[in-house]
């Protein structure tokens, strides 16, 4: 066989392997997808036993020049497919009673892929369709930061056309512990090794877990401000508990009694959006439950035709779960505040936003740790508008950090996807909110 024929054969084989990860049709969606979707695995570690699964969706605008985002869901252990379907992707799930076939999908109007390329990553290992070839060892915040950095380096080496695109690391909820540390890791990696460097520009976080012990204490003043507890509960709590409402000293019996009263008042409040009907998110199989779509996404992702369409490795995964709560995990980053500070010193842009009806990570807590950074505000607290209506409030700081609230928003973008999209669109374009 001539050298030329061998080369052509290798070229055809390479093209076949590459095109095998391109997804043009999805069960439940009528016709070909109106966007470019690639799925695949990247091995992590020396032996590549950890296999991170990703969805890559090209920008619908100008993929060659638009920003590249890497999106991480929270949990830890929640699949990025939830981000695609419920928060900021180009397809969503129709609210229909499950009939045994793959649930139906529809095109969204609020996808961030309208002006950005996005890598949606299933991490840590064990979440979504990511898996390990060997039994999963206990992982944690720090090890996942390093693994995700390795993933990004390898992904870019396979997609070198995106090296020059501005990179932003984005996520929400528990990824508030991972994203700032990952930004620092990428930044330091650019100095230590690797040519060309990753074109890191900044990061974006929604209702981020940042310092859990600190943040939980703000649930009580938030509940009081929203009228969930009375003066008779709040004023003594403030005085007797000294601002420490969690991990209460067992000898402080008065504080313990008051916290019991608080829990009685809020036990049936949906912590992710206080105006949303409460139902058990671990049992969402009833169509009457607000979170019934969480059941539908599990039905969809566990459909064999869906797995074939997404090119899921056969035998790599049992039942897909929206959030895998069984992953052995060390919460070894206590606070991500120092990472925010270091990233600001390095000159990276950041947008921190809060749905103002979230009590899990109240906007009061996020404002408090931002204040602790002691950065000068560029402008005073002001409303930001959509169609001449207030969509939230914002303040920008001298360290390139912007804080914004989303009026009526909850713990994730799914509660106000259109407003979150417009906020993202303005910020990523360098416009004031």
Swiss-Prot record:
Q: Where in the cell is it found?
A: Vacuole
**Which class of enzymes does this protein belong to?**
transferase
Q: How is its activity regulated?
A: 95% inhibition by diisopropyl fluorophosphate (DFP) and 30% by phenylmethylsulfonyl fluoride (PMSF).
Q: Name one GO cellular component term.
A: vacuole
Q: How is it modified after translation?
A: N-glycosylated.
Misc. remarks from the entry: In cv. Pna-10, this protein SCP8 and the adjacent SCP10 are not present due to a natural 13-kb deletion.
Q: Record's family?
A: Belongs to the peptidase S10 family.
Q: What is the name of the protein in this document?
A: Serine carboxypeptidase-like 8
Identify the species of origin.
Answer: Arabidopsis thaliana
Tell me the name of the encoding gene: SCPL8
């Amino acid at each position: 066989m001539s050298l030329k024929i061998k080369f052509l054969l290798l070229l055809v084989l390479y093209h076949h392997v590459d095109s095998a990860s391109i997804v043009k049709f999805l069960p439940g969606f009528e016709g070909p997808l109106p966007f470019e979707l690639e799925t695949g695995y990247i091995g992590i570690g020396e032996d590549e036993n950890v296999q991170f699964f990703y969805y890559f969706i090209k920008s619908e605008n100008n993929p060659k020049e638009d920003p590249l985002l890497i999106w991480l869901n929270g949990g830890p252990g929640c699949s990025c497919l939830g981000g695609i379907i419920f928060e900021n992707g180009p397809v969503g799930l129709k609210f229909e009673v499950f009939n045994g076939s793959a649930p139906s999908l529809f095109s969204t109007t609020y996808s961030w892929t309208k002006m950005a390329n996005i890598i949606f990553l299933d991490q840590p290992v064990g979440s979504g369709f990511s898996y390990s070839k060997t039994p999963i060892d206990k992982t944690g915040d720090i090890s996942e930061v390093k693994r995700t950095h390795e993933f990004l380096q390898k992904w870019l080496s396979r997609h070198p056309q995106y090296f020059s695109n501005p990179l932003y690391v984005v996520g929400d909820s528990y990824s508030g512990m991972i994203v700032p540390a990952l930004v620092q890791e990428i930044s330091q990696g650019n100095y230590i090794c690797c040519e060309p460097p990753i074109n890191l520009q900044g990061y974006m976080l929604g209702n981020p877990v940042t310092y859990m012990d600190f943040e939980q204490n703000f649930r009580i003043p938030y509940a009081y401000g929203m009228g969930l507890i009375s003066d008779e509960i709040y004023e003594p709590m403030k005085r007797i508990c000294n601002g420490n409402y969690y991990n209460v000293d067992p000898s402080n019996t008065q504080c313990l009694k008051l916290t019991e009263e608080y829990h009685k008042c809020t036990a049936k409040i949906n912590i992710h959006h206080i105006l949303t009907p409460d139902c058990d998110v671990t049992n969402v199989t009833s169509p009457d439950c607000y979170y019934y779509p969480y059941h539908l996404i599990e039905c969809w992702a566990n459909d064999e035709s869906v797995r074939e369409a997404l090119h899921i490795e056969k035998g790599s995964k049992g039942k897909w779960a929206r959030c895998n709560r069984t992953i052995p995990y060390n919460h070894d980053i206590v606070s991500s505040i120092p990472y925010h500070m270091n990233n600001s010193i390095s000159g990276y842009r950041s947008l921190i936003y809060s749905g103002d009806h979230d009590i899990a990570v109240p906007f009061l807590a996020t404002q408090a740790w931002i204040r602790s950074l002691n950065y000068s505000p560029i402008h005073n607290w002001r409303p930001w508008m959509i169609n001449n209506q207030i969509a939230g409030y914002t303040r920008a700081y001298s360290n390139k950090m912007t804080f914004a609230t989303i009026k009526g928003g909850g713990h994730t973008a799914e509660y106000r996807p259109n407003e979150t999209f417009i906020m993202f669109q303005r910020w990523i374009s360098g416009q004031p909110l």
